[in-house]
Amino acid sequence: MNEKYAALRANVGMLGQLLGKSIKDHQGQAFLDKIETIRQLAKSSRKGNEADRERLLETLRTLSDDELLPVARAFSQFLNLANVAEQFHTISRRCEEQVCTPDPLEQMFAKLKASNLSQEAIIQAVRELDIDLVLTAHPTEVTRRTLIHKHVQLNDCLEALELSDLLPRERDKILNRIEQLVNQAWHTNEIREQRPTPVDEAKWGFAVVENSLWPAIPEFMRNLDERLQQHLGVRLPLDAAPVKFTSWMGGDRDGNPFVTAKVTAEVLELGRWMAVSLFYKDIKELTSELSMSDCTDAVRERVGDHPEPYRALVRELREALRETQEYLTAKVQGQVSESRDLITTTAQLREPLELCYHSMHACGMGNIADGMLLDVLRKLACFGIHLVKLDIRQDGERHGQVFSELTRYLGMGDYAEWSEDDKQAFLLNELNSRRPLIPTDWEPSDETRETIDTCRVIAQHDPDAFGIYIISMAGAPSDVLAVQLLLKEAGCKFRMPVAPLFETQEDLMAGTAVMERLLSVDWYRGYIQGRQYVMIGYSDSAKDAGMMAAGWAQYAAMESLVALAEASNLRLTLFHGRGGTVGRGGAPAHQAILSQPPGSLRGGLRVTEQGEMIRFKFGLPKVAIHSLNLYTSAVLEGNLLPPPKPKESWRAVMEQLATVSCDHYRSIVRGHPDFVPYFRAATPEMELGKLPLGSRPAKRKPNGGVESLRAIPWIFAWTQNRLMLPAWLGAHKGLEHAITDGQKSVLEEMSRQWPFFRTRLEMLEMVFLKADLWLAEYYDTRLVPQELWNLGKQLRQELADAIQIVLQLRPQGDLLDDQPWIKESINLRNPYTDPLNVLQVELLGRSRSHTETLHPELDQALMVTIAGIAAGMRNTG
């Protein structure tokens, strides 16, 4: 056992014992003994004891129907508690340096000062920081909000236990509260009864802001400001917002028919209501703080001879916020309310607060001004009165459909059949025209009306409420111009940024040519005014070509887009659509940022944060502060001390790796006749549809095959059976080919000197430690028809070969030896995840052999194993 993580193991042990007590009180000692037997057998099986492995299988196979659900719940709940303990450990006082970078910003400023950079260059880079974290609903965020809330409270209790001067009765009180929370969790159904609506998802996002990001931002800003003062002698401006938040929840309608224009409008109002409510609380508290009487003439002019000038100013704000809150409450509830003197812009709040701030500093009260008042100003700069900006995303085909219907109605032929040049000519002509294009008597289809209504919602709201408009499957300049024309026709008076999303390997490779053609359009250059966004899709490109080929396609696309932006004198912001898993572009934030091409961060960083990753990275204020520090230090390093440009020899090897790995990946996923039936038999893909996860359907087309399956359930299914196929398939063949071709020394050099390549290998190592050949084989022998066994055997052999190939490229040691914390984290969970896998196989077998409807408890048990394995793997889709 690794003594280094003794504090973590002690907390895991304590929570496990309390869960055991809850189980015993509810199910009896005999049942708890059975759970403990299964746990010990799983640990022994992990160590290679074949006899205990057989006993484990026998014990789980012979469970009665009414035992399956509580056994699944016991292991699933333990894994959730282990995650709570681990998340706490990363912010604990006892956290080891290998786990928690003590202060990433402090280390970064020291590193920058030690470099040859001028002080002015560093200050400029800090002032130009532009990090936009985009919160997205996640179809595989399997943990219910009610359980997340209990887990947050558990975290608070673990923190309180660390205080060294606790009295015995205080300690007992905390331990009793922990016991209550564990007991509450055990008696709470972990699977939600109904699929969440898009509005439910948006409320979940707002709850993350309220509970975690709202308190985290002022602390993060204070830390950054102090480091800047300490190292460079300057402070951040009052309106500095190096980090901002955007949301897709209620705005992302690509493939989700439940996100309508009405839903988007409702989510926008809810966001405003939440922001006003939070600022009202803060301003109310601030009123009690600002009792001072000294002030500048500028404040006196506003409040007259009031004895408490700051309170007088802030009370006016408080009343305006209260009125706005009442108005928005009525509006959200569908009631008509009189429009009064409402807060409609961030400036209405900022101006009087800045007046107070400058007055206090002028009157020798800078220390007071830099307290809660500065915190409110920092929140205003970050969140504004909309809380988060809302992105809109729609499939490019839907915009084309509007113009197809319209041109047919107008007798102009079918827009869909026109050449790209004809489409552009039509769109540009209409963009330059002053007359409306859409006739008032036109009756479009429901889908087309919905697309137009969405643009009208955008036109009716404040520009500050929105981020950007993203077009999925964008392949031509007309895709972008079509959206701009729709916005014009809807009466939109502001220039909403429109970003094409390049997501397949082919789209990524063609992306720069598309942008080049678009930028050659004079009207478009005038519209964007020197600022362009492009979204890079990680999930679909990996599903399309495999992780290695997709990674290189993403890198090459970014590199050529950056070169185009420089040549065109544009500020380009690359928007990274990454997931939490390796198969969807996931990697620790710092590594992912530093493995991007040099120059790709000049226009800022914009990246999606999804479902379960939002919870792991931003679910607690202290965890959120640490994550924000990591992002900031990584972006500063990426801009000021960028990684080297790849050598020509490295590029040649990567081209070869990408070609070989993509060919092999596609030969299996697209070319093997048995692949689709094998995938459906060997994973719970068909059963995943039953799980009431996100609001979005799992498939783009209900009757489609693997190609229509969304990237998230595709990854989720392979994670469940522990083959982890999308995260490695193809990569090993590329590496093997390069080694056989005499390029091993080049690969080793790439691993040492090039963050992009090193990150790929590290991600493979993590995946290999989570994968399990024995369990993958067990799924096959129990669930897969015998005529498909050969494919399963081939894939497992390829996984075993892949592990050996990656080990060859390690300087020494075993998988993840140089990342002991991640290794410890995976090893801690594996013995608790393994029984859930065996149980899942048992439940899938019973479910598939029942022609009639399965007993609800067995259905529930299957859902619990899916959620539990997701918790054990720590990243789902």
UniProtKB/Swiss-Prot annotation:
Gene Ontology cellular component annotations, sorted alphabetically: cytosol
In the record, the note on similarity to other proteins reads: Belongs to the PEPCase type 1 family.
GO-annotated molecular function = magnesium ion binding; phosphoenolpyruvate carboxylase activity
- Some GO term, biological process aspect, for this entry: which one? carbon fixation
Cofactors (names): Mg(2+)
Tell me its EC number(s), please. Answer: 4.1.1.31
Give me the reactions it catalyses. Answer: oxaloacetate + phosphate = phosphoenolpyruvate + hydrogencarbonate
Q: What is this protein called?
A: Phosphoenolpyruvate carboxylase
Catalytic machinery residues: H138, K543
Biological role: Forms oxaloacetate, a four-carbon dicarboxylic acid source for the tricarboxylic acid cycle.
Q: Which UniProt keywords apply?
A: Carbon dioxide fixation, Lyase, Magnesium
What Pfam families does the database record attribute to this sequence? PEPcase
